[in-house]
A protein has these predicted regions:
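Bacterial Sec-dependent N-terminal signal peptides
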Residues: 1-19
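Start-of-domain marker
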Residues: 17-84, 95-97
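A cross-kingdom marker for long, charged
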Residues: 24, 211-269
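Second-shell loop/turn segments in exported
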Residues: 28-35, 123-131, 243
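Sec-exported extracytoplasmic/periplasmic mature domains
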Residues: 46-54, 142, 146-150, 262, ...
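Acidic/His-rich structured neighborhood in mature extracellular/periplasmic domains
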Residues: 79-190
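Alpha-helical segments in soluble extracytoplasmic regions
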Residues: 170-236
Length: 269
């Protein structure tokens, strides 16, 4: 069984890496380029994400958050070392007392453009950002960890999500798309700003109620878990939509939850 408290202990000397990421680089659209550059990119990114300790939280090895980054390279300028991609980012969480894993994040970043030369080493300092590729993966590392923590305690990811917002503000000087406020309502800035908007607290509460009080309870008492899920959907999801109609967070969440929700209510009219 996975220990809930291990996600919540700060400053532990045994703190370890939080993420177990799998990176996939789909470069089928690119011809005439040595595949080794894509292989090196994939290996560099997995080391960067998986070997770094992003917070002071204590995660056992078997508690690391499984996540996937599927990058599709649309253009590659080998003279300038610029990759123009879109990225599908997904993160999962185990459900207590079961073999089932549930998705906690699934979204496409259409502005995943960066510079990378083969054998580059990624350096990262969130206060003085000067590397777009490191900033992209740090952003999603903080976002995923913060969302995961929200599923284990109400607003539990606040500190980590604030770090994600701080990084986003510091990334404004990077000359790449996706970081600017008001560019569109689905870019990286818009997503993290919405998570931290007080009007979206019902959406954050939904994460705890749905996963911890709902799914985690279903192995012991399916009806009680289902009731918790119904209540939070009717109250918190509805309230989040009313509070901020232009936010895409509820729609993104509903899109990747629709199949799971159908299974939860299967045979229940």
């Amino acid at each position: 069984m996975i220990s809930l408290t291990s996600w919540l202990v700060c400053g532990n000397p045994l703190a370890a890496q939080e993420l177990q990421a799998k990176i996939t680089i789909n470069h089928a659209q690119i011809s005439g380029t040595d595949n080794s550059v894509f292989e090196n990119l994939q290996q560099t990114l997995e080391r960067f994400v998986n070997e770094r300790q992003w917070t002071s939280l204590h995660f056992q090895k078997n508690e690391r958050i499984n996540c996937n980054f599927n990058l599709t390279v649309g253009k590659y300028d080998k003279d300038q070392n610029i990759f123009t991609c879109k990225a599908l980012i997904q993160a999962n969480r185990p459900v207590y007392n079961s073999a089932y894993t549930t998705t906690i994040y699934n979204n496409v970043d259409e502005s995943f453009t960066f510079k990378f030369a083969q054998f580059d080493q990624l350096e990262f300092n969130e206060e003085t950002l000067d590397n777009q590729l490191a900033a992209l993966f740090a952003y999603y590392a903080y976002l995923i960890i913060g969302i995961d923590l929200d599923t284990f305690s109400p607003m539990g990811g606040e500190d980590v999500l604030q770090r994600c917002m701080n990084l986003t503000n510091n990334a404004q000087n990077l000359d790449f798309p996706g970081w600017k406020a008001f560019d569109n309502n689905r870019n990286r800035y818009a997503l993290i700003a919405d998570y931290l908007d007080g009007a979206m607290q019902p959406f954050r509460q939904l994460q705890y109620d749905y996963y911890r009080k709902g799914l985690d309870e279903m192995a012991n008492n399916a009806e009680r878990g289902r009731t918790e899920i119904t209540t939070t959907l009717e109250e918190n999801l509805k309230k989040a939509r009313e509070n901020k109609p232009l936010s895409l967070l509820p729609q993104i969440w509903t899109d990747y939850k629709k199949d799971e929700l159908a299974n939860i209510y299967k045979g229940k009219g």
